[in-house]
């Protein structure tokens, strides 16, 4: 699962909890992504700036491709949500070359993209 998928999973979990509340005014918009081309360098003359707005937070990242800019900005949003304590009960796992197809991923403490699953 990547950071964009984690944001979507968090959004769906929040929507489910909002539907269970009696108020009709609760609605959480899905993560919104905005792209604009920016001046790059010689190797990548055009880079992409991705801005994400989600749940009172916003983040901006600039990378060579739209996909990598989107993932980097989603990572920043996930860090903000984690710092606020909103990602409790959510986990993020990546498949690495060290894991087999049917096994779990090995935890690498040097990576910052693993969130611990909490109750």
From Swiss-Prot:
Keyword Oxidoreductase: no
GO cellular component, as recorded: host cell mitochondrion; host cell nucleolus
Keyword tags: Apoptosis, G0/G1 host cell cycle checkpoint dysregulation by virus, Host mitochondrion, Host nucleus, Host-virus interaction, Modulation of host cell apoptosis by virus, Modulation of host cell cycle by virus, RNA-binding
Protein name, per record: Non-structural protein 3b
GO molecular function, one term: RNA binding
A single BP term in Gene Ontology: symbiont-mediated perturbation of host cell cycle G0/G1 transition checkpoint
Subunit structure, interactors included: Interacts with host RUNX1 isoform b.
Domain DRBM: 2-83
UniProt source species: Bat coronavirus HKU4 (BtCoV)
Main location: host cell
Function: Induces host cell G0/G1 arrest and apoptosis.
Subcellular location(s) per record: Host nucleus, Host nucleolus; Host mitochondrion
Keyword RNA-binding recorded: yes
SUPFAM superfamilies reported for this sequence: dsRNA-binding domain-like
């Amino acid at each position: 699962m990547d950071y964009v998928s984690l944001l979507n999973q968090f959004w769906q979990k929040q929507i489910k909890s909002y539907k269970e509340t009696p108020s009709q005014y609760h609605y959480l918009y899905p993560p919104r992504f905005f792209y604009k081309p920016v001046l790059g360098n010689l190797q990548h003359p055009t880079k992409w700036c991705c801005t994400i707005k989600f749940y009172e937070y916003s983040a901006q990242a600039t990378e060579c491709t739209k996909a990598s800019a989107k993932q980097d900005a989603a990572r920043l949003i996930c860090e903000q949500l984690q710092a606020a304590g909103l990602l409790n009960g959510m986990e993020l796992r990546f498949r690495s070359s060290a894991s087999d197809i049917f096994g779990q991923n090995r935890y690498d403490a040097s990576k910052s993209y693993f969130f611990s699953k909490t109750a």
